[in-house]
Amino acid sequence: MRLLKTHPILGLANSYLIDSPQPSNISYMWNFGSLLGVCLIIQILTGVFLAMHYTPSVDLAFISVEHIMRDVNYGWLIRYLHANTASFFFIFVYLHIGRGLYYGSYKSPRTLLWSIGVIILVLMMAIAFLGYVLPYGQMSLWGATVITNLLSAIPWIGQDFVEFVWGGFSVNNATLNRFFSLHYLLPFVLAALAAMHLLALHEHGSSNPLGVSGNTDRLPFHPYFTFKDLVTIFVFLLALSLFVFYMPNAMGHSDNYIPANPMQTPASIVPEWYLLPFYAILRSIPSKLIGVLAMFMSLLILLGMPILDTSRIRGSQFRPLMRFSFWTFVACFFILMFIGSQHVESPYVEIGAAATAYYFAWFLVVVPAIGIIENTLMDIALTEETSSFHRVV
């Protein structure tokens, strides 16, 4: 035990995973960190093994993926683990962010922790998009063409910048090579950001469902929370196994089993399900440039939450108005996800525009307004209480 505390590396592990004091009342909503860590480890390991057999070439990419599936020992398992864990990764990230928004985890003193988390989200989406292109099926090619073409909205240099990203005049061998290179590199950057996220968390410790700060009533991470985390990790592995072994393509797109053909456009070009809400925001605005800016701002606006939430109370658990508005925001997010998967036609265009307007209004109008209303009501109540106390005295 003494070595565990004094050794420079083991001591670090001890302070994070064994002796770290955690609030005794944190619920299962605080388990997503460990689940995301497991997802990241699975993704890096399976990704490295897939890269050993993958060929980043427009002629051989699709064939090399089929080779992995048919000829490599347990190649099908590695690929399906990689594809389905990516979906679970995003499910857990969205739940993690939702918990952060509900319980006010972005408020001081955890603003740095929140900011690093938002950067991780943006990087995850970039990595997911790069990976979606690599099998080089129909959705891969046309998804890459559509999304990279968004850069052409940049004034003056847009088209030149798109061709710079492509390495030619269309999606070609150079594009696939650089996408593969970046898709291999960026998860390690993501792992470094995850380490920074943990460092920032360790500075002030975890928040808790009550939203109060304090060093009393805490428990060591091990054994209490290691075993609590193991419960959700095993449930996740069971759910992942169900998808991998029984319905491995449920969260994918069947068009990606058709080899990429630049001469034939698919009936509908849609990204993976976890990018659909932001794709819906992009499509809801007629102006290309404003649509692209709105799509990026829909993610980056999360960075503003510590400023936009004007309430003196951390979290929504004791704030009925905020709690109601939070669930309307969740409903709006799911509506956007549905709209992103539909064709660009009435009434989906109108519903998407309304949902996009509410998405931004929630951050810029609803959250600040509710905070101001609550603060005002508290001030009035406090003033009345003080005046009645003075009358009694």
Swiss-Prot record:
Please give one Gene Ontology molecular function term for this protein: ubiquinol-cytochrome-c reductase activity
Task: Tell me the residue numbers annotated for binding heme b b562.
Answer: 82, 183
Protein name (record): Cytochrome b
Subunit-structure text? Fungal cytochrome b-c1 complex contains 10 subunits; 3 respiratory subunits, 2 core proteins and 5 low-molecular weight proteins. Cytochrome b-c1 complex is a homodimer.
Query: Record keywords: Iron included?
Result: yes
| The family this protein is said to belong to | Belongs to the cytochrome b family.
Q: Which residues bind a ubiquinone?
A: 202
Query: How does the cofactor attach, per the note?
Result: Binds 2 heme b groups non-covalently.
User: SUPFAM superfamilies per the record?
Assistant: a domain/subunit of cytochrome bc1 complex (Ubiquinol-cytochrome c reductase), Transmembrane di-heme cytochromes
Q: What does this protein do?
A: Component of the ubiquinol-cytochrome c reductase complex (complex III or cytochrome b-c1 complex) that is part of the mitochondrial respiratory chain. The b-c1 complex mediates electron transfer from ubiquinol to cytochrome c. Contributes to the generation of a proton gradient across the mitochondrial membrane that is then used for ATP synthesis.
Q: Name one GO cellular component term.
A: membrane
Chief location bin: mitochondrion
Q: How does it sit in the membrane?
A: Multi-pass membrane protein
Say if the entry is tagged with keyword ATP-binding.
no
The record's subcellular location field reads:
Mitochondrion inner membrane
Name the CDD domains on file. cytochrome_b_C (cd00290), Cytochrome_b_N (cd00284)
Q: Per the entry, which co-factors are needed?
A: heme b
Q: Which positions in this protein are listed as binding heme b b566?
A: 96, 197
The alphabetical list of record keywords is: Electron transport, Heme, Iron, Membrane, Metal-binding, Mitochondrion, Mitochondrion inner membrane, Respiratory chain, Transmembrane, Transmembrane helix, Transport, Ubiquinone
Q: What does the record's miscellaneous section state?
A: Heme 1 (or BL or b562) is low-potential and absorbs at about 562 nm, and heme 2 (or BH or b566) is high-potential and absorbs at about 566 nm.
Q: Which residues cross the membrane?
A: 32-52, 76-98, 113-133, 179-199, 225-245, 289-309, 321-341, 348-368
Give the matching InterPro entries: Cyt_b/b6_C, Cyt_b/b6_C_sf, Cyt_b/b6_N, Cytb/b6-like_sf, Cytochrome_b, Cytochrome_b_C_euk/bac, Cytochrome_b_N_euk/bac, Di-haem_cyt_TM
* Domain of life the protein comes from: Eukaryota
